[in-house]
């Protein structure tokens, strides 16, 4: 018995200023790309939510300083967004240019027990792990920051 051929993976790749206006525009591009490739329902909603969380973190903590618009950046800072759909799963990765220690972020992704509800930070990344099958952090390809990669199997939830 042979299995049906798996569709080729489709990728959306964006390099944008690390500002909230870019993240807002990218959300629309990610949604359009995913819908054009047949993603819908809970899988689409989760992709948009996770992409938004990763981009927002890149803007706020990955070198963008929380800038709303590009004019507010003290220096040019970019984020790189990749969305891959392969017919069985999606993945989204966001790389920033804000330095950082992968071990510190990994601890936020995989805390011992629930995150402290009194802490002002750290819950978003943890909550993101509940919607994904895996979330990883590593040094970005340009070594200027971090790259977070989230994956979800389609229809698994």
Model-inferred region functions:
Residues 50-51, 144:
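Short secondary-structure capping/turn micro-motifs that flank functional sites
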Residues 1-13, 59-157:
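Conserved beta-strand-loop-beta-strand hairpin that lines the nucleotide-binding pocket
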Residues 1-49:
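Bergerat-fold GHKL ATPase/HATPase_c domain
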Residues 53, 57:
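Conserved polar catalytic motif of the HATPase_c/GHKL fold
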């Amino acid at each position: 018995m042979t299995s049906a051929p798996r569709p080729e993976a489709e990728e959306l790749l964006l390099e944008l200023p690390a500002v909230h206006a870019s993240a807002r525009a990218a959300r629309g591009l990610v949604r359009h790309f995913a819908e054009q490739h047949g993603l819908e329902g809970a899988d689409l909603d989760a992709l948009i939510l996770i992409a938004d969380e990763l981009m927002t973190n890149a803007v706020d903590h990955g070198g963008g300083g929380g800038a709303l618009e590009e004019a507010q950046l003290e220096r040019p800072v970019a984020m790189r967004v990749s969305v891959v759909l392969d017919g069985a799963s999606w993945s989204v990765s966001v790389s920033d240019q804000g330095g950082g220690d992968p071990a510190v972020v990994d601890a936020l992704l995989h805390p011992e027990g629930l995150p402290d509800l009194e802490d002002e930070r750290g819950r978003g990344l943890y909550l993101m792990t509940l919607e994904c099958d895996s979330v990883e952090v590593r040094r970005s390809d340009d070594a200027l920051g971090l790259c977070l990669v989230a994956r979800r199997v389609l229809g698994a939830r």
